[in-house]
Amino acid sequence: MGERVCQRTATELSSYPTELEAHVTLTDQRRIRIRALHSREERPMRVLHARLSPRTRYLRFLSPIPTLPDALVRRLACVDYRRRLAVVAEDEAAGCAGVVALASFSAVDETTAEVAVVVQDDWQRQGVGTALVSTLLDAAEKRGFDRFVASIAADNWIIRRLLDRFGRVVTSHTSLGVSELVFVRR
């Protein structure tokens, strides 16, 4: 499925969204650069995943994944900038080697997108997640998505609070420690 899903036309691949690029000063005065993940750009995801604590990995993937399987990395890196988009935050001091967070959306249907976000532990609670989710949801809305779905650990109050800032939950279902949230932008 991974290879077939990632076959893109030249037009899709040439439509890299430079308008998503931004520089942000965080609450601790560190600076990040936000940009879209390039199609098939796998390395930042692997580097970021290796830097995450086991708890943060669990909260993101709802499973203790010590290393990202190749098939999952290929699927996550398969972006077309319309129905699948990912944005990363880079530590400006470290450049491209310093990816500290990633947020993504993937179309569920024509108006609904599934969203996910992860921030490296030592960069959490500084505004990185807020900046990335804001960029991601703005981009999704410009592409016609007005409803969002997120699967989160039921005890992940940090991401729940972050999503509450950006939207109003219209449905929520929790089972076996996982909450499925459907929300719309405020």
Where are the regions that the model predicts?
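Long, contiguous binding/interaction regions
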Residues: 2-186
